[in-house]
């Protein structure tokens, strides 16, 4: 089984308000079921963490770099307040592959070139993910994705990691201002 280049941590979000809770925090629209690529920002619009969000029938899985899992859990718990949500780490293998998307797997939302992701057991070939990621200019947390940078500087728009039509989220005002100041009128 091929696994991502770096270990991944999984957070499970449950509760009746799970979608609305995360929708108000992250850069991408996660209102539909499936796999989404998104980020959490500071109120000043700077990068904190990028991750995948898998919206399922009864819960949401957050697939984040293993090194960011504790800080992301802490930050999300801080925002939880009275929301009817529970956030907890869970064990779930993350597998990736290329070629046709197998049953139970999801196309990588950043670009088709990165293949698919599956949560749970899934057979796949051994792949040099680092070479593939570099060839397709996909930034990696801890390498090219650095804290206190703006996500538009790190190409999140090209990677389908930000939705300019979804409405408010933490840091949205800064991101929108940067986007619209760089467009020709």
Regions found by a protein language model. Give the residues of each.
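Basic, glycine/lysine-rich polyanion-binding surfaces/domains
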Residues: 1-185
